[in-house]
Amino acid sequence: MLQYSKKKVSLNFFPVRLLSYKMTRISDAIFKDHRKLQSDYQNIKSANDYDTATRWQNQFVWELARHSVGEEIVVYPKFEKYLGEEGKEMAEKDRHEHQLVKEMLYKFQSMKANQSNFIPALDELMESLQKHIDEEEQHDIPFLEKHLSEEESLHMASSFERTKKFVPTHSHPSAPNKPPFETVAGLFAAPIDKLRDMMEKWP
């Protein structure tokens, strides 16, 4: 195991219902992504060599970049649509938290696993991300689910998964974080990111 830092980030794991893809609610889709990100983080921390750490770094960046933009395009507009003024405040709060995470991810994605500040940068990023995850899983997403029919929730989950296929796979903190401008910016950035992905190493 690579010994960069002894800092531990507390990861909270909330249960995800085991449903088929066609019957996944939006909360299940989002929480499943959160579990993947926590797993990627732990795999980086437990890597026995720099090559393995780099592969999981690429996976973590790929997952987090797509997840963040997917939420901003599909989920946060629904906060504003269904949850009134509180929903608007939630959306702005979450966008602000995403922006901070994107800026940290932008720095982390260009770092090398053998740099002395590689793991400290990851820990700082994960600490902020975990706080955001806790808020979404304990309050924001359950609150939204209460205002959605099952059909609406299933449709949102499908849109969320579909959107992630077309968005950038690396962090672009200077890009817009609201649709439709974020959608347009993503369509331009995504092809370049996907070419970059072809040159990366993966788990």
Curated annotation (Swiss-Prot):
InterPro entries assigned: Hemerythrin-like (IPR012312)
Residues engaged in binding Fe cation 2: 97, 172
Main localisation: mitochondrion
Location of this chain's protein in the cell: Mitochondrion
Keyword annotations of the record: Iron, Metal-binding, Mitochondrion
Record-linked PANTHER family: HHE DOMAIN PROTEIN (AFU_ORTHOLOGUE AFUA_4G00730)
Annotated family: Belongs to the hemerythrin family.
Protein name: Uncharacterized hemerythrin-like protein C869.06c
Organism expressing this protein natively: Schizosaccharomyces pombe (strain 972 / ATCC 24843) (Fission yeast)
